[in-house]
C-alpha cells in the first residue's frame, strides 16, 4: 500500500517558488552584469552558462527522470538511490566537464569570441556538483518532500546571486562565473543533509537492479532532452557564431524575461511527473481505478492551460516595465524580441505539462519522438533565419519551434492516455475554484502534510 498522497496543489505552489528561484537569480545576476560590464559581458556570461548547462544535461544521461520514476513507484529506497546517484553524479559530471572543455576549445575563436580558457574552466567546474544536487532533487520530488526540494533549489539560487552578484563588481565576468561552482557545491551539500534525514524515514525495500532500471528509463528521457536543447539553447550558440556578443546579450535578456512564463507550468510539470507515475502504479495494483488516474492527469493539464493567462500578463509587464527600468536603453530591442518569443513560450508551457504526463505514464520514448521530429525543422529555421536576421531570426525560429513541440506533445498525449481533448484542455469552473481551495490549504499548511 502506498503512503497517503499530499495535495498536488501544495506541491505545485511550493514548486512555483522553487522554479522562480533560478530565474530570479539569473535575472538579478544578468542585471548586475549588464549594468557593470554591458551587453557584451552579458552575452559572454550567457554563452558560458549555456555551455555548462548543456554539458550537465549531456552528462546526466537522463538519470534524474529515472530516479524520480523508480523512487516514486516504490522500487528504490532513498538510501540506495542517494548513494548511487551521488557517485554517478560526480563521475558523469567530470566526464561532462571535460567534454564541455573540448567543445569550448573547438569553438573558442568563433562562437566564444576568443574568451580565456580559465573562464570556461570556472563555468564547467560546476557540472559535477550540479548533477549531484539535481539527482537529490529527483529523490525528494519522488518522495513528495516539497519543502526539502524547495530548500535545496533555493539554497542553490541564493548562493549564485550572493557570490556571483557580489564578486562581479571587483572581478567582472570572472567574479560572476565563480558563483556557478559555488552555488552547485552548496546545493550538493544541502542535498546530502536532506537525504540523510529522508533515508531514516523511508520504509521501501530494494528489489535489486534499481540503478539499471533508472538508467534505462532515463536514457529515453535523456535522448529527448538532448534533442530539445536544439530548441531551447542552440539559438544562443548559433547566434554567437554569426552576431556580436552585444547582440547575444540583448537576445539573452529577452530569453530570460520570457522564460518566466514557464515558472507556473514547470511547477505543475515538476510535481505531475512523479504523481502520474505513482497513480499509474496504484491503478495497476488495483488501489484506484484507471478513470481516477485519468481524471487527476486531465485536471493537471487543464490547470496548465489556465496558467497561461497569468503567465502572459506577467511577461508583458516584465517586457514593458522591467527591461527599461532594470537594463536601460541599450536593451530596448529585448522588449520587441520578447514579444516575438511570447506566443511559442506560452504554448510550450502547456506542452511541458503534457510531456510530463506522457513520461509519468511510462512512455518517455514518446518525448524522444517529439524532440526528434521537431529538431530538424528547428535547426533548419536557425540556420536559415539567424545568418539573415541575427537575434530577430533567432527569436522567430525559437517561437515556431516551441509551438511545434507543444502540438506534437498534444498528439502523443492523446495516444498514451486516450483522454479526450475537451476533457484535458477546456478548464472547468471547479478548476478555477481550486485556487480558492489552495488559499485555504495554504493557511492550514504544515510541513510534510
Q: Each predicted region: which residue ranges?
A:
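Interhelical loop/hinge segments that connect adjacent transmembrane helices in multipass membrane
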Residues: 1-4, 8, 121, 147, ...
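Transmembrane helix-bundle signature of multi-pass secondary active exporters and lipid flippases
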Residues: 49-57, 228, 251-274, 308-311, ...
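Interfacial segments at transmembrane-helix termini and the short loops linking adjacent helices
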Residues: 39, 106-123, 295-298, 316-346, ...
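Signature of the first transmembrane helix
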Residues: 4-64, 161, 216-246, 256, ...
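Helix-loop junctions and terminal segments of transmembrane helices
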Residues: 59-76, 141-142, 254, 258-297, ...
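Membrane-interface junctions at transmembrane-helix termini in multi-pass inner-membrane proteins
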Residues: 70, 129-151, 343-371
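Hydrophobic alpha-helical transmembrane segments
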Residues: 117-124, 150-199, 217, 377, ...
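Membrane-water interface segments that mark the loop-to-transmembrane alpha-helix transition
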Residues: 9-23, 48, 60-105, 118, ...
Amino acid at each position: 500500500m502506498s503512503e497517503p498522497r499530499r495535495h498536488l496543489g501544495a506541491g505545485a505552489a511550493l514548486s512555483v517558488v522553487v522554479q522562480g528561484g533560478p530565474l530570479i537569480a539569473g535575472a538579478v545576476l544578468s542585471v548586475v552584469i549588464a549594468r557593470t560590464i554591458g551587453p557584451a559581458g552579458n552575452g559572454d556570461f550567457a554563452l558560458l552558462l549555456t555551455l555548462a548547462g548543456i554539458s550537465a544535461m549531456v552528462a546526466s544521461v537522463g538519470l534524474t527522470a529515472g530516479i524520480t520514476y523508480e523512487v516514486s513507484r516504490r522500487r528504490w529506497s532513498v538510501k540506495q538511490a542517494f548513494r548511487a546517484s551521488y557517485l554517478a553524479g560526480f563521475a558523469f559530471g567530470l566526464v561532462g566537464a571535460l567534454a564541455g572543455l573540448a567543445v569550448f576549445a573547438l569553438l573558442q575563436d568563433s562562437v566564444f569570441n576568443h574568451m580565456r580558457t580559465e573562464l570556461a574552466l570556472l563555468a564547467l567546474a560546476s557540472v559535477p556538483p550540479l548533477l549531484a544536487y539535481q539527482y537529490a532533487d529527483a529523490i525528494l520530488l519522488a518522495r513528495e518532500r516539497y519543502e526539502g526540494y524547495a530548500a535545496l533549489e533555493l539554497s542553490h539560487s541564493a548562493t549564485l546571486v550572493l557570490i556571483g552578484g557580489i564578486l562581479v563588481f571587483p572581478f567582472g565576468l570572472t567574479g560572476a562565473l565563480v558563483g556557478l561552482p559555488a552555488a552547485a557545491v552548496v546545493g550538493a551539500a544541502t542535498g546530502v543533509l536532506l537525504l540523510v534525514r529522508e533515508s531514516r524515514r523511508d520504509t521501501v525495500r530494494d528489489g535489486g537492479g534499481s540503478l539499471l532500471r533508472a538508467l534505462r528509463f532515463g536514457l529515453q528521457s535523456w535522448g529527448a532532452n538532448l534533442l530539445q536543447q536544439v530548441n531551447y539553447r542552440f539559438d544562443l550558440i548559433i547566434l554567437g557564431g554569426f552576431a556580436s556578443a552585444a547582440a547575444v546579450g540583448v537576445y539573452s535578456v529577452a530569453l530570460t524575461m520570457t522564460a518566466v512564463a514557464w515558472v507556473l507550468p514547470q511547477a505543475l510539470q515538476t510535481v505531475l511527473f512523479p504523481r502520474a507515475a505513482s497513480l499509474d502504479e496504484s491503478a495497476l495494483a488495483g488501489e484506484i481505478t484507471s478513470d481516477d488516474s485519468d481524471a487527476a492527469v486531465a485536471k493537471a493539464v487543464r490547470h496548465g492551460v489556465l496558467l497561461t493567462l497569468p503567465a502572459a500578463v506577467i511577461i508583458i509587464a516584465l517586457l514593458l516595465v522591467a527591461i527599461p527600468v532594470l537594463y536601460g536603453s541599450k536593451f530596448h530591442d529585448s522588449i520587441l524580441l520578447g514579444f516575438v518569443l511570447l506566443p511559442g513560450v506560452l504554448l510550450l508551457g502547456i506542452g511541458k505539462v503534457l510531456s510530463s504526463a506522457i513520461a509519468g505514464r511510462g512512455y518517455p520514448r514518446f518525448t524522444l519522438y517529439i524532440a526528434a521530429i521537431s529538431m530538424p525543422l528547428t535547426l533548419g529555421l536557425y540556420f536559415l533565419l539567424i545568418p539573415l536576421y541575427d537575434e530577430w531570426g533567432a527569436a522567430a525560429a525559437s517561437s515556431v519551434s516551441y509551438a511545434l513541440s507543444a502540438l506534437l506533445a498534444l498528439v502523443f498525449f492523446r495516444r498514451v492516455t486516450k483522454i479526450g481533448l475537451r476533457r484535458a484542455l477546456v478548464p472547468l469552473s471547479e478548476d478555477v475554484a481550486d485556487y480558492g481551495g489552495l488559499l485555504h490549504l495554504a493557511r492550514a499548511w504544515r510541513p510534510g502534510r
